[in-house]
């Protein structure tokens, strides 16, 4: 069931509008507010053009842009409660639609955060997340320290947000699903060389966790004519691609998902109920399944002793090669 990608919503459907936002050019503080206002116009237009949309999702970097020369300029960063978010929250309230947004956020205690915020249809913040796995060494952001939150959304959705490179680590989607998420949003700024990995991880994150994944990247050229991919994608709970976008800047790609289907599958599937079976290994032979943790990497991570066999030979261990200098120097100025 697709309901014509949300034109005729199935009962219980969550209709998504994934915006392949044009890469913005940010040169001065006023550009941030102007960009937020442009995105707010897209939010209002999407809801007006397709009133069935419940949630509009903007990609990573859609306010702050992709120019690394601006990323540690304190005047070109945002605040969680700053004017840019006020504009976007106002658009959600006016249009009566939920929204998911991205900001590069000031951090008085260190390197900036790469943050995502979900706003409901009354303009209230419902989820706040800091990217846990920055795309090192290219990105200078502080690693998120708040875990992966989950919030209630429209139509029975339990929403989680992971950002860009987060989705390349299967543990991230697994954690979101383990905490109850049945719809996992993924926002990104990826360019075309990452296209294949983007597709397979979006599908795998859905299948491995019996969750819908809804993912979108920036689109169009940056100042050097390097294009972000767009490539909005919604995957069913079995990993099947329901809807896939292209590279068109500012295209709103729509799709419907039915959160109750994910909930039901998690209860009724036998084979391939992987998120349950991870903690109940071999339950056909062992009452309740084996409940131990046989994974060395998990044990070492918990103990603070995570170390790959080739650790001493890894070439890139800080951002110096990407021009950021040693970690102690990575601060907004």
PLM features: what roles do these ranges have?
Residues 33-122, 126-128, 191-209:
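Cys-nucleophile CN-hydrolase/nitrilase-fold catalytic domain and related Cys-dependent amidase chemistry
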Residues 1-55, 185:
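N-terminal active-site segment of His-dependent metallophosphoesterases
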Residues 3, 150, 217-333:
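C-terminal beta-strand edge segments of enzyme domains
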């Amino acid at each position: 069931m697709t309901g014509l990608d949300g034109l005729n919503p199935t009962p219980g459907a969550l209709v998504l509008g994934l915006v392949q936002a044009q890469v913005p050019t940010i040169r001065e503080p006023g550009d941030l507010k102007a960009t937020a206002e442009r995105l707010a116009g897209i939010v209002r237009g999407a809801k007006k053009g397709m009133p069935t949309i419940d949630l509009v999702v903007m990609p990573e970097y859609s306010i702050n842009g992709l120019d690394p020369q601006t990323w540690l300029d304190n005047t070109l960063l945002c605040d969680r409660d700053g004017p840019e978010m006020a504009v976007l929250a106002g658009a959600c309230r006016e249009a009566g639609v939920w929204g998911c947004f991205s900001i590069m956020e000031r951090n008085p205690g260190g390197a900036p955060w790469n943050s995502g915020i979900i706003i409901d249809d009354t303009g209230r913040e419902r989820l706040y997340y800091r990217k846990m796995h920055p795309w090192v060494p290219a990105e200078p952001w502080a690693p998120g320290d708040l875990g992966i939150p989950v919030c209630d959304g429209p139509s029975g959705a339990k929403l989680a947000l992971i950002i860009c490179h987060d989705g390349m680590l299967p543990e991230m989607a697994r954690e979101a699903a383990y905490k109850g998420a049945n719809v996992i949003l993924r926002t990104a700024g990826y360019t075309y060389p990452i296209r294949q990995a983007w597709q397979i991880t979006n599908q795998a994150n859905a299948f491995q966790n019996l969750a819908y994944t809804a993912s979108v990247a920036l689109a169009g050229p940056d100042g050097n004519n390097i294009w972000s991919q767009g490539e909005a994608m919604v995957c069913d709970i079995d990993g099947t691609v329901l809807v896939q976008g292209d590279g068109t800047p500012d295209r709103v790609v729509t799709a419907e998902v039915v959160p109750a289907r994910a909930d039901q599958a998690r209860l009724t599937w036998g084979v391939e109920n992987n998120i349950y079976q991870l903690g109940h290994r071999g339950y056909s032979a062992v009452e309740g399944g084996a409940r131990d943790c046989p994974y060395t990497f998990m044990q070492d991570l918990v103990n603070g002793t995570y170390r790959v066999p080739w650790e001493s030979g890894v070439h890139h261990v800080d951002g110096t090669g990407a021009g950021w200098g040693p970690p102690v120097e990575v601060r907004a100025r």
